[in-house]
Amino acid sequence: MNIVQETKRRLAAALTDAAATARAAGEISYDELPDFVIETPRDKTHGDFAANLALLLARQARQSPRNVAAAIVRHLERPQPGVARVEVAGPGFINFTLDNQWLLPVLPAVLAEDDHYGWSNIGQGAKVQVEFVSANPTGLLHMGNARGAALGDSIANLLTAVGYDVTREFYINDAGNQIENFGLSLEARYLQALGQEASIPEDGYHGEDLVATVGRFIAKYGDKYLDTDPALRREMLVRFALEEKLDAIRRALEDFGVTYDVWFSEQSLHDSGAVARAIADLEKAGYIYEKDGALWFKATSFGDVKDEVVVRKNGIPTYFAADIAYHRNKFERGFERVINIWGADHHGHVARLKGALQALGYDPRRLEVVLMQLVRLYQGGEILRMSKRTGQYVTLEELIEEVGRDAARYFFVMLKSDSHLEFDLDLARSQSADNPVYYVQYAHARICSILRLAKDRGLEVPPAREARLELLQDPAELELIKQIAAWPDTVAGAAQALEPHRLTRFAHDLASLFHSFYTSCRVLADDPEVRKARLVLVEATRITLRNVLHLLGVTAPERM
């Protein structure tokens, strides 16, 4: 149940009728009623809901917004069920203050819907693909990858909760120049390990981790590939190393609570001819031309600032060409929406990719790109640039060891993705109210403690229909119920905007309101009817808080 949306619809219908009555009475004039919104005001003194109808209607009516609002309010059917007060405020908002009766259906709905409270069917089963992380398989996962993992998985959870059929996908960059350099670097380490003279390319991979990888390769194959064809040797080394690296990436992501439905190989696009077909089809459509021995895509025809090479002068397709084929493949697999989580450094890639898809006949709006900014780790008040253990960048595995999965996932989605994130390791480890995830989890654990205490006294949470919920009249109780009632709307809004940071804000507010309620109201009150009602409220809070944390991929502990 979404009591907030139901109430908004009812108020919107009442305003529409009142505006029509005011027009019939000659008090206002308009040709067509504009699309207006009813929102929850941030300032509680402005009531429970505020409508902007009069502000939008003023120009047609040729009156001030306040005069239009006053005319509409005069013709509202009275009494409106559940409405305690209607007033014109500010420049012409129509504010509604409701009586507490409108909140009564919320708590029974929460207990009935349980782990699906907040879910909806907005997506109606439409197929959506979320591609995220897609890290370079030649290395380990860094903080940018970690933020992308938390962000992408939370977005996928949100879309599932609002009724989409979601596929999580990891794109394996196992083709192109980087893999060629990776193979040459592995080959050099292999030959060196077997006593041969060899040097790593200047732009190759110089990390010591390749020494260990080659050592395991030799343990399995010995010098079998020492005197073989160099191309075969590199192929075998790359195949072995990529399998190891991808296994490590997969394990790290699983430890982070992220699992994928599809691992898609870039090389498969070349092997199947999909890249060549995409280029040929763009050429047939008139969007490919030759210059300086290379083939170029006319990205400027679609609003980009410059055209882009798709085939180099040496005849090798670019990464962009493979990306065109990959995204075409996504739509060929039947996805109605395709969502990519990319680093902000890829912002220039968005317009040209959308242009290529449009050139191939696809609606570019079906591709949505969420860009995320950099992450900076702080420890002891200073930027932590390198791992103290390895001397290289801090990996996801090390972060999980340092602060735990829950804190890492929560911190990574606390801010909007296009904001730089300063990740304070000391704060993430602290067990205090200053730590946002600890604060929220502690609220859940405290609720569970209350329910255990009640059980020890022979008390259970009663069925909501058996509780006199109208007894919940304390301001702290009512504010808590209002926050619980706002959860379905919060999920829908966060899913629509692809903004999971809204959930962390909601979780913090819900935890704060619960702590205030706990301070103001004795849950296990002497009055048995009040006690029953408060137990229902506490259980509804627990369910809602757990549901928020689960969408974020964070556990809801029963003890802390």
UniProtKB/Swiss-Prot annotation:
Keywords per UniProt: Aminoacyl-tRNA synthetase, ATP-binding, Cytoplasm, Ligase, Nucleotide-binding, Protein biosynthesis
Superkingdom per UniProt: Bacteria
Subcellular location: Cytoplasm
One MF term in the entry's GO annotations: ATP binding
Cystine crosslinks: none
A GO BP entry: arginyl-tRNA aminoacylation
Signal peptide: none
Keyword Zinc: no
Residues spanned by motif 'HIGH' region: 135-145
GO cellular component labels: cytoplasm
Catalyzed chemical reaction(s): tRNA(Arg) + L-arginine + ATP = L-arginyl-tRNA(Arg) + AMP + diphosphate
EC number: 6.1.1.19
Keyword Signal part of the UniProt annotation: no
Main location: cytoplasm
Class of this enzyme: ligase
Family annotation (PANTHER family): ARGININE--TRNA LIGASE, CYTOPLASMIC (PTHR11956:SF5), ARGINYL-TRNA SYNTHETASE (PTHR11956)
Protein's name according to its UniProt entry: Arginine--tRNA ligase
Species for this entry: Moorella thermoacetica (strain ATCC 39073 / JCM 9320)
